[in-house]
Structures are given as structure tokens and as C-alpha cells.
Curated annotation (Swiss-Prot):
Species assigned in the record: Synechococcus sp. (strain WH7803)
Organism superkingdom: Bacteria
Functional description taken from the UniProt entry: RNaseP catalyzes the removal of the 5'-leader sequence from pre-tRNA to produce the mature 5'-terminus. It can also cleave other RNA substrates such as 4.5S RNA. The protein component plays an auxiliary but essential role in vivo by binding to the 5'-leader sequence and broadening the substrate specificity of the ribozyme.
Catalysed reactions, semicolon-separated: Endonucleolytic cleavage of RNA, removing 5'-extranucleotides from tRNA precursor
Protein name: Ribonuclease P protein component
Length: 131
């Protein structure tokens, strides 16, 4: 299942915020960036209303470069795998953090799904986001 729209992080200003202000946690196959949320940076529609309904919740983006794998099918499968894993982790939590997360995969991250998910959990725990 895909990540719900209320949990997705979109827009170049949000990504710039994460790159400038985010704390980085490094793993073998991925980098996790965590920053406090900033509702002013979220996308708005033509009427000035937020396009996403919950401005104060955990929002997540997964970025997978073409260097990870040359085939888009493989990159999309990895993105869906991480989206589903993160959705299950954050929906199970009773309290929602007011943070934004950006997960960037490094080249070679398509090696083993189990190791990838294990590393994701380890980085979330290191960032203080694992229950």
C-alpha cells in the first residue's frame, strides 16, 4: 500500500529545508535526514489553502537516484517497499512526531530487502523515532 497523501512530503522548498536544517543519520545503504516540520513551506492551492490536510504530522519522502539501479522498475519497487514499511511504523504509533523525514538511498542499496529494512529501523531508532 502507498504512503497516504497526508504523510507525503513534496515540494522543493521542503527538500531545501531538510537539506539545510536536517540532522543526518548515516547507514551503509541510506541516509536519513530529520528536521522539525515547518507548515509555512507546504504546498498551497490557488486559494491559499494547504493541499494536504494535516499540516502538523510526520511527513516522509524517499529519494532513489538512478545510481542505485538503472531500471526505474527496480527503483520504484524499492520506493514502494520503504513507503509501506514506514507507513506501518508510523501508523502504529500512538503519538505523532512533528518532524519531516527524507530517506536517500545510496548506490548498491538494491542488494537485499531485509537488510535495507533493518537498516531503516536502526536509523529511525538512532533518530529517536522508533517506538
Amino acid at each position: 500500500m502507498v504512503l497516504p497523501a497526508s504523510m507525503r512530503l513534496r515540494g522543493h522548498r521542503c527538500f531545501d529545508h531538510l537539506h539545510r536544517r536536517g540532522k543526518r543519520y548515516y547507514g551503509t545503504w541510506m541516509v536519513l535526514r530529520k528536521a522539525p516540520s515547518n507548515a509555512k513551506l507546504l504546498r498551497r492551492d490557488i486559494h491559499g489553502l494547504l493541499t494536504q490536510t494535516q499540516p502538523h504530522s510526520c511527513r516522509i519522502a524517499v529519494v532513489i537516484s538512478g545510481k542505485v539501479h538503472k531500471r526505474a522498475v527496480v527503483r520504484n519497487r524499492l520506493r514502494r517497499l520503504l513507503h509501506d514499511h514506514l507507513r506501518l511504523r508510523f501508523e502504529a504509533r500512538s503519538t505523532h512526531s512533528d518532524v519531516w523525514l527524507l530517506i536517500s538511498l545510496r548506490p548498491g542499496a538494491d542488494a537485499d530487502e531485509a537488510n535495507l529494512l533493518e537498516e531503516c529501523d536502526r536509523l529511525l531508532e538512532e533518530a529517536g523515532l522508533q517506538p
